[in-house]
Amino acid sequence: MNARIAELLHNYLGRPPSLSEYHMLKLQHRNIQKIIAFNKDIFISLIKKNKKKFFSDIDLTSSEIKTSVLSYFSKQRDTYSIGKLYTIIELQTILVSTYTDVLGVLTLKGPDMFPSSTRYDIKSIKQIATSALHAMNVAVLSDKVMGRHNVSPLVSNVNALMEEYLRRHNKNCICYGSYSLHLLNPEVKYGDIDILQTNSRTFLIDLAFLIKFITGSNVILLKVPYLKNYMVLKDKDDNHIIDSFNIRQETMQVIPKVLIDNIYIVDPALQLMSMFKMFSQIDRLEDLARNPEKLTVRLATLMEYVRVKYGVILNGESNHMPMKGVLDKDKRIIVMDTSGYNFSFKKCFVYMDESSLSSDILDLNADDAVDFENVSNSAYLVKGDVLYTYFSNTILLSDPDTIHEISNKAMSAHILIYQILTGNDIRQPLSDLVNSLMYNEKVLIHEVIPRDKKTGKHGIIDIEKDIITH
């Protein structure tokens, strides 16, 4: 045994390391040095300040917070499982290396904020949005309640923290969804705050510890296999606190953004395309049937932004939009005719199974596919005059052989997402797609073609049980 490392492990474990502990943990000696040297008093002070600023309604006392922190940093002394020791060291290392910069900084005075004057009045466009959604309100309601509706009482506290976090970390964290639209139009109501960031795992682990230390309750982090790079933080009752998608820095750089009140939001034109896509998912149409007013305000806000920014004239002239698709049910591939626009491709092969697209890209011997991760939920490849891509939602049919207009619009929007993220001009097709929302009759759904089935196990980080499976 190296005497210096053995002494370090003895100090950390509160006991002489066994031979097995020494050999398994000796390579962790640098992390253990950081943990031992970490100033717990300053850390406890930051936790208390975070509590005062964002969780003042929680009753835990300063003494209880201190006890909770010190207890966790000595947890290894009563742990003999090598696997659990590895977990404790990993999580403690994340805390001592990142907490101050990620969440501790939120307690300091921030930079001056320059309130945005960008606000949108939707009165003139709300009737168009109402009519558009009325035509799309064609789902038959089921009794199934999606997990996203089970909301933790901690959400309002975390939202306050997230607003500050988005301002301080706006180079690597941006928001989308209802909160971003609330910044444009206060009429939009929001629940939790939807975010994309480049350090999602670290942020959520730090936040999980903050909640644990100031509430005294355990929280867990789940990684869902059918959503790429997605993690959700849940409380002890399995209620949703916050979720986050992780993206690469390269993806972050190509996302068009708008700065509002020192917070970057995903450009609403891109969000409108995502909303078009969303409506092809049958459970989202059920949401529309349950609460049309909520979606009306959101759609109207997005449409008004696009109308103003892109000079869209709302006259119902939709030209080639939505682009038409033909479904091969056996191959689960839709061929979209894109020849009406000046794209770099004349048609688009839309795959309903991601593995089939990946296989065909390999067969094409192409190495220039682009993947925008959760922003598009698909890779794209242009080869010859064909765009190859994957569509992750259900496809609706209006009769046995005809794709419903809702799904044609969704796939058209998916194609425009590629055009937006690759920096191409989208003014004409965007104008046409928005105008295709006007003057539509309600057409019932004949059949729902199911989306790609993703398999895999949920990953979990459980601080209380010293478990990391992702």
From Swiss-Prot:
Q: Which reaction does it catalyse?
A: RNA(n) + ATP = RNA(n)-3'-adenine ribonucleotide + diphosphate
Q: Which GO terms describe its molecular function?
A: ATP binding; poly(A) RNA polymerase activity
The question of whether Aminoacyl-tRNA synthetase is a record keyword is answered with: no
Name the UniProt key words of this record, in alphabetical order: ATP-binding, mRNA processing, Nucleotide-binding, Transcription, Transferase
State any GO BP term from the record.
mRNA processing
Does the keyword Nucleotide-binding feature in the UniProt annotation? yes
How would you classify this enzyme at the top EC level? transferase
EC number of this enzyme: 2.7.7.19
Q: Active site annotated at which positions?
A: D192, D194
Q: Name one Pfam family in it.
A: Pox_polyA_pol_N
Indicate the family of this protein. Answer: Belongs to the poxviridae poly(A) polymerase catalytic subunit family.
How this chain assembles, per its entry, is: Heterodimer of a large (catalytic) subunit and a small (regulatory) subunit.
Summarize the protein's role: Polymerase that creates the 3'-poly(A) tail of mRNA's.
**Name of the protein in question:** Poly(A) polymerase catalytic subunit
